[in-house]
Amino acid sequence: MSKQNQWIVGVNAVASSVENDADNVREVLIEAGSKNPRLTEIEEQARRKGIDVRRVNTQALDGVGGQVRHQGVAARYAAARLWAENELEGLVEAAQGRALVLILDGVQDPHNLGACLRSAAAAGVTAVVIPKDKSATVNATVRKTSAGAADRIPVVAVTNLARCLRDLQKQGVWLYGLAGEAEASLYSVDLRGNVGLVLGGEGDGLRRLTREHCDGLVKIPMPGDIESLNVSVATGVTLFEAVRQRLGA
């Protein structure tokens, strides 16, 4: 696993980090003179957990927040753990025939990636796989959007997605790619065993090579006039169909 220091800003993101990932929080910055009770709560909790807290001016917070609205608070801490590709095999084995792996083929918008991770954590996935290149990374925006989910599930960054898919298949993981033109419905396939759900990025969807490595393609039936869903919405729909089947098994 690898980690690097980064800044997280915003009340909810910092509060979640202090509550759920205190061991990795290096320090908390709070706007001097603020009377916001939420900031007081964050400061008190951080101090209880032994985290350094500094009161700073707005300019200092602007400097670490960049273009993201900081709401008077920021935290410096080790980024979410990124699991190595060779650790994925052990995660699948530990699931004992019921692995649920989410594979995201080039989701570039950090807000979408964060929303996908949040759904993945809620669904209890075994791991989320993302490419190291041509994909959003688990940065401050992703962590804020994920509401702490990036800390709770293994996110595996891989150099070669096609090779990773082949390795999953060797472990008995059946790969279903989501594609609007597919003939089979998501609701017609068995998602109860070792399953990998593969979704493409914004715009182009699954890349050709990724499609070729899927064992089957499925679609979400949409009787309305809209032909596609946002990738984070499609991820939630797909994951929770798997959850529904598994809970009913």
Curated annotation (Swiss-Prot):
This is 23S rRNA (guanosine-2'-O-)-methyltransferase RlmB. NCBIfam families: rRNA_methyl_3. InterPro entries: 23S_rRNA_MeTrfase_RlmB, Alpha/beta_knot_MTases, Ribosomal_eL30-like_sf, rRNA_MeTrfase_TrmH, SpoU_MeTrfase, SpoU_subst-bd, tRNA_m1G_MTases_N. It catalyses: guanosine(2251) in 23S rRNA + S-adenosyl-L-methionine = 2'-O-methylguanosine(2251) in 23S rRNA + S-adenosyl-L-homocysteine + H(+). The lineage of its organism: Bacteria, Pseudomonadati, Pseudomonadota, Gammaproteobacteria, Lysobacterales. Belongs to the class IV-like SAM-binding methyltransferase superfamily. RNA methyltransferase TrmH family. RlmB subfamily. Its main location: cytoplasm. It comes from Xanthomonas campestris pv. campestris (strain ATCC 33913 / DSM 3586 / NCPPB 528 / LMG 568 / P 25). One of its GO terms (molecular function) is rRNA (guanosine-2'-O-)-methyltransferase activity. Pfam families: SpoU_methylase (PF00588), SpoU_sub_bind (PF08032). S-adenosyl-L-methionine binds at G200, I220, L229. HAMAP family: 23SrRNA_methyltr_B. GO terms for cellular component: cytosol.
